[in-house]
From Swiss-Prot:
NCBIfam families: PRK02958.1, tatAE. One of its GO terms (cellular component) is TAT protein transport complex. The chain crosses the membrane at residues 1-21. Gene3D superfamilies: 1.20.5.3310. Residues 53-62 have a biased composition (Polar residues). Residues 39-51, 66-85 have a biased composition (Basic and acidic residues). The Tat system comprises two distinct complexes: a TatABC complex, containing multiple copies of TatA, TatB and TatC subunits, and a separate TatA complex, containing only TatA subunits. Substrates initially bind to the TatABC complex, which probably triggers association of the separate TatA complex to form the active translocon. The gene is tatA. It is a single-pass membrane protein. The keyword Membrane applies. InterPro entries: TatA/B/E, TatA/E. Residues 39-85 are annotated as: Disordered. This is Sec-independent protein translocase protein TatA.
Length: 85
């Protein structure tokens, strides 16, 4: 009574196919597959970008820390907003 038989699962599958249709289910499956493939490719690229023997450059005691500027970094400053009126 507690477990579902194969017939229960087949009936559920038929109802899902009638509600969503086979085309919609196919689109969902292909979207899910391409998302998983994109995730795996991204993880693979991330591992290739980071060589195994690379380490962070260490600073010497007499030098101030260097600032790294990237073309995509935007330097901003926060201001307090006070109520006027």
């Amino acid at each position: 009574m507690g477990s579902f038989s194969i017939w229960h699962w087949l009936i559920v599958l038929v109802i899902i196919m009638m509600v969503f249709g086979t085309k919609k289910l196919r689109n969902i499956g292909s979207d899910l597959g391409s998302a998983v493939k994109g995730f795996k490719d991204g993880m693979r690229e991330g591992q290739e970008d980071k060589p195994a023997g690379s380490q962070q450059p260490q600073q010497t005691a007499g030098q101030p820390p260097r600032e790294l500027h990237d073309a995509t970094t935007i330097d901003v400053e926060a201001r307090d907003k006070s109520k006027q009126g």
